[in-house]
Amino acid sequence: MNPQATDPIDDSASTESAVSRKAKAKPGQRRMEILQAFAAMLEQPMAERVTTAALAKRLGVSEAALYRQFASKAQMLDALITFTEDSLLGLAAKVGEPGADGVDGRAACGQIVWLALQFAQANPGMVRVLVGDALVFEQARLTERVALLFEKLEAVLRAHWRHWASQQGLATPTADAQVRAALLLIYLRGVLHAFVRSDWKQLPTQGADAHLEALLG
């Protein structure tokens, strides 16, 4: 999401400038401001659980103002997960369709994981969502959504590797693809956890070239 500094949402009508900003702000812009602030709070080292009260305070608005844009905190997290899923699967799609002409499945797997690592490095707040830190004490379905996201990403890796293994004439391309995709996902998730646990000091892309070369064989 690359949260950037934005003018806070102003829920007060006490000044003319506040009223002017409020009048100009569109619902979509307000929702984005809220999500950017949420992500920025998640980026803080040793970040505590983000509450709607803390989020409202950061934005300089009332909690009621937040709930006019999102029905619940869970809905905000849903939006962050959607952003992350669209981004990761979108990046994977840019590598090319599995089995498409000119697409090297083995190389594609490495590129997809590399792009995911780059995304994580640029969006540390989203990494807290992916590793589950931001979902502690939240609705179980949110954790299930993240699990499904990883399943989708693994399926893309599996498809790429299966096509490559078939082209190489390997005896068990499907089984090989299952193992390789699982290993790549384990690596990716491990790197994300290390990024969080190090308070963003252990960068996801650090040493990734050598790691991926070893994993891809």
Show which residues each predicted segment covers:
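Amphipathic alpha-helical segments used for helix-helix packing
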Residues: 120-144, 193
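N-terminal intrinsically disordered/low-complexity leader segments
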Residues: 1-29, 96, 168
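Hydrophobic/aromatic-rich alpha-helical bundle segments in the mid-to-C-terminal region
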Residues: 2, 127, 143, 147, ...
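Short hydrophobic/aromatic patch on the recognition helix
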Residues: 60-70
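A short, glycine- and basic residue-enriched loop/turn
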Residues: 31, 47-49, 64, 73-74
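Short helix/strand-capping hinge loops at secondary-structure junctions
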Residues: 41-50, 70
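Alpha-helical structural segments
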Residues: 29-40, 44, 54-58, 75-98, ...
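Short glycine/proline-centered loop/turn elements that form peptide/ligand docking sites
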Residues: 17-21, 49-51, 59, 73
